[in-house]
Amino acid sequence: MKTFPVSIVTPDGPVYEKEVEMVSVKAESGEMGILPGHIPTVAPLKISAVRLKNGGHTDYVAVSGGFIEVRPDKVTVLSSSAEEANHIDIHRANEAKRRAEQRMQDKQAHVDFKRAEMALQRAVNRLNVSDMK
């Protein structure tokens, strides 16, 4: 099967750069599957896992939202943070989840509930992706 290059990039630099046969992402408008030769598209992403298939192997990368740019010959994902499944520190992700849950339960006026909720979603996503190794 044909392959195409995929780059997942954060402000700190590239996180994933490989040739793949298919990319699956969760866009704000729904699930997208991208194969070689896909029409050009730009879409905002949800906090989710990016699935990258090549042969019988699938890589998973946790992204904290961002955008996907699809060209017929290349796909680029831009995200504020991204981690490959095998690089996720499970202890750190569990701690982040615990802190976010605590902030949400405190219900104090100075707590930004939406930020705590987003932090919880990011931590849960990282834990889910780490289980996909």
From Swiss-Prot:
Record keyword Transport present: yes
Lipid bilayer topology: Peripheral membrane protein
Name of the gene this protein is made from: atpC
Pfam families, sorted: ATP-synt_DE (PF00401), ATP-synt_DE_N (PF02823)
A GO cellular component annotation in the UniProt record: proton-transporting ATP synthase complex
CDD domains, A to Z: F1-ATPase_delta
Name by which UniProt lists this protein: ATP synthase epsilon chain
Function according to Swiss-Prot or TrEMBL: Produces ATP from ADP in the presence of a proton gradient across the membrane.
Keyword annotations of the record: ATP synthesis, Cell membrane, CF(1), Hydrogen ion transport, Ion transport, Membrane, Transport
UniProt cross-references to Gene3D superfamilies, sorted A to Z: ATP synthase delta/epsilon subunit, C-terminal domain, F0F1 ATP synthase delta/epsilon subunit, N-terminal
Presence of keyword Membrane: yes
Assembly: F-type ATPases have 2 components, CF(1) - the catalytic core - and CF(0) - the membrane proton channel. CF(1) has five subunits: alpha(3), beta(3), gamma(1), delta(1), epsilon(1). CF(0) has three main subunits: a, b and c.
Residues in coiled coil: none
Similarity comment: family membership: Belongs to the ATPase epsilon chain family.
PANTHER family (UniProt xref): ATP SYNTHASE DELTA/EPSILON CHAIN (PTHR13822), ATP SYNTHASE EPSILON CHAIN, CHLOROPLASTIC (PTHR13822:SF10)
InterPro entries according to UniProt: ATP_F1_dsu/esu_C_sf (IPR036794), ATP_synth_F1_dsu/esu (IPR001469), ATP_synth_F1_dsu/esu_N (IPR020546), ATP_synth_F1_esu_C (IPR020547), ATPsynth_dsu/esu_N (IPR036771)
Subcellular location: Cell membrane
One term of GO molecular function: ATP binding
Signal peptide: none
